[in-house]
Amino acid sequence: RLGRGDDAVVRKTYHNRGRRWLQSFGRRCRAQREFDNLREVAATGTPCTAPVDWSEQRRFGCVDRSTLVTRWVGSSRSLKEVLAQLPASSAFRERRHLLAAMARLVATLHRGGFLWGAAMPRNVLVVGEPEQAQLAVCDVPAGIPIRHPIHGRPLCLYDLFDGMFSPSRRAQFSAAERWRWLLAYADGDRDLARRLWRTLDRRSVLRHDVGRALAMFWHVYVVQPLRRSRTRTPRPER
């Protein structure tokens, strides 16, 4: 954290070494990807950390390090941290409230046409006290702007698996909690929640990882360049 009051910001620096350094050749740096994605998230109406600026240092076309600057969000902690520290006397009620709020956060992103790529409790900020908290997205370098709704559609499964159906999430949350999470995502639509549950319950980690990698390749290296070429301003005729 740097500065005070409304001017306070958070600066995150990402370093690339070895294979990761070589893979950065000719590509957008992580700080730029996250900066652009946070603006996309804000455009969907989803609360998130506000991007301020980014910078990078390259060598031979590869990124040595990049820095992202975002607004400081006061009185906030990660959802993972909050869930671990809830007092026993109110844990059930507040845990239920927070998980439903996270599911609605993901649903808002998907209705706005954004695939998070890292929909996990550690990447959700809880702003304020848990019982009345507002939730916000805070880490999106792996996100993909799809630009059309993906809520309840095949692409949404990648975020839902990360959010509540990966092996670590299955160990962390009960089946009842995961069902209520899906039901909140589906806005109470039990038929949709059941359909998503059946698909997610059968999904393996290998299938999830391979499918997500293919989806990212298609949208990042095919769809987005085509989109940029179509929206490029034509040169004026001489």
What does each model-found stretch correspond to?
Residues 88-90, 173:
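Inter-helical turn/loop segments and adjacent helix faces that build the functional surface
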Residues 28-29, 96, 172:
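Residue-level marker of alpha-helix boundaries and capping positions
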Residues 1-80, 89, 104-112, 116, ...:
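Conserved ATP-binding subdomain of kinase catalytic cores across diverse folds
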Residues 126-132:
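Activation-loop N-terminal segment of eukaryotic-like protein kinases
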Residues 119-126:
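Hydrophobic residue at the +6 position relative to the catalytic HRD Asp in the kinase catalytic loop
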Residues 210-238:
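Membrane-proximal basic amphipathic "stem/tether" segments
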Residues 133-221:
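C-lobe/activation-segment region of protein kinase-like
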